[in-house]
Each structure stands twice: as structure tokens, then as C-alpha cells.
Amino acid sequence: MSARLIYVMDPMCSWCWGFAPVADALVQQARAADVPLHLVMGGLRSEASPLEPSKRRYILEHWQAVEEATGQLFLREGALPEGFVYDTTPACLAVTAARSLEPERAWELVKLIQQAFYGQGRDVTRPSVLAELAEQAGFSRQQFADAFDSPEQQAATAADFTWSQDLGIAGFPTLLAERNGQLALLTNGYQPLSELSPLLGRWLERAASA
């Protein structure tokens, strides 16, 4: 029997940050049942131009709404500074690079990127920042940098984006449970742990007895 928890997300997605404590608890619940996590990057934004002031205001208002809905704190003061290009591709590439090196440890990097961006206001579109965070997560800085710069991981990141699009996933966070190639949707969008933990628990019980 082959089973895994698939989390389709983007490290720079505000709802994924709001969902972070729930996701972490579910990952631990699955791992306790020997079901590993597989991360798929969704590719939220690939902007090429700096944010317009009106767009920045809109995003910060959205962050406030997510904070109110989930209880996750966002650092809004000084966030998204003038000239910031909201391109999530480098952060996604960082996770696929980490996944290629140590799949289980990639989750630690996701959490560090989210905390750096939403909790500390750091520019996680910069490769140097991502390399620093990867080192904090326990990766060799040089090995990470080599993977980050490799055509193979650029292709893997693009393949993640395509996979989620082909599956019809229109929003993040999306959590799937896979058993023997069959996918079950746990959630598309934020839900509290009180709703999702029993749902995952029932799926894990069925997976264990399959």
C-alpha cells in the first residue's frame, strides 16, 4: 500500500500562511501514521513589474482579512515596499530544490519562508535570502544553491505548476490524500483543524486497513 499526503500550496500565498498551523498539525498527524508529505508548488504569482500602490493596498487589506479569519499574524507595517515585485516563482523553486535534496526536510524550509515573508517582512524573492533560509532548515548552502540554479529543478517547478492546473486546482491551500494512486480531496481552501483532523484521521484508518 502506497499512501501520502499531498499539499498543493505556494510559500507566498496569504491563505497558506493563515493555514500554516493547521497544515503543520496535519502533517504531523500523517507522519505519525507513517504517511509522508509530498509538497506541490502551485505558482501563485509571476509578476514582472513592481506593485502599484493601489494593488499594494488591496493585498494588505486582504492580509488583514486572512488574519481576522485565521488568527495568524501578518506583519503589515513596511511590508511590500516600493519597488517590490510579487513573483512567487523563486520561493516555489526553492522548495522544489529542497524537495530534490531531502523531501522530508523541505517542509521545514516552507515554514521558514512563510515566517520570513509574512512574519518578518523579508524579501523571499531573493535567492540569497532563500539560500540563507535553506541553511537554517538544515540544507548545505552549496548543494541547495546548485539545485536552485539547475535546469532540472526549474523544470520540476514548472511541472508542479502544470500538475496543479491540470488537476483543476484553482486556489490554495489544497490538501489531498493519495492511496495507491487514488486522490481524495481533504480541502480546497482554509478550514480549521477541528474540521480537518477527524477527516484525515478517518482516511488514515482506511488507508491502514486497505
What are these regions (language model features)?
Residues 1-6, 35:
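Extreme N-terminal starter segment of soluble prokaryotic enzymes
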Residues 2, 10-12, 58:
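Alpha-helical structural elements
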Residues 8-12, 19-29, 112-210:
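C-terminal cap of thioredoxin/glutaredoxin-like
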Residues 13-15, 61, 105, 201:
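Short, low-complexity intrinsically disordered segments
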Residues 20-121, 126:
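Structural alpha/beta surface segment adjacent to cysteine/selenocysteine redox centers
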